[in-house]
């Protein structure tokens, strides 16, 4: 299951690798608060600002953004005149402003700049991730292929054809 950090980078269309982002997220001491999310986004070059919107006017926000609800974080994707569309635990939801305002604390993490955002050493990490996936897939395929080739080349020795006669 993807973390909020992965979902947010997806919403921003920022390149990342699964291994690097999960290690960063799991090892971060503040992964469950806005400070930690901000610091992890800094690693990717996403400049963010933590704000408190006192009047809770959702239309004043830049989207996508991270919104703090009571005990959780959601990713605000877009805000219309009457509804807000957001992502919570990987599920997209649309709610009326009034319903969402009951759970939103007014705290948000908004993006200031993300045009050049990317994972540090992204190309190296991507190459390593592809190589790892290839090893994971190639070894079983080679094993199965060698069994099939071995059986085919020794079909007379096994006696399968003699049984069919």
Task: Describe each PLM feature range.
Residues 17-19, 49:
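A local structural micro-motif
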Residues 2, 30-60:
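Contiguous, structured surface segment used for ligand recognition
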């Amino acid at each position: 299951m993807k973390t909020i950090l992965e979902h947010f980078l997806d919403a921003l269309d920022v390149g990342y690798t699964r291994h690097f982002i999960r290690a960063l997220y799991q090892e971060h001491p503040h992964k469950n608060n806005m400070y930690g999310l901000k610091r992890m986004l800094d690693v990717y070059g996403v400049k963010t600002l933590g704000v408190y919107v006192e009047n809770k006017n959702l239309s004043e926000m830049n989207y996508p953004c991270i919104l703090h609800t009571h005990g959780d974080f959601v990713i605000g994707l877009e805000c219309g005149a009457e509804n807000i569309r957001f992502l919570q635990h990987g599920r997209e939801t649309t709610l009326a402003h009034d319903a969402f305002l009951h759970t939103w604390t007014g705290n948000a993490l908004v993006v200031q700049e993300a045009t050049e955002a990317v994972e540090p050493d992204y190309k190296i990490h991507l190459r390593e991730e592809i190589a790892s996936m290839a090893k994971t897939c190639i070894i079983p395929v080679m094993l199965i292929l060698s069994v099939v080739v071995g059986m085919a080349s020794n079909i007379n020795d096994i006696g399968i054809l003699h049984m069919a006669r």
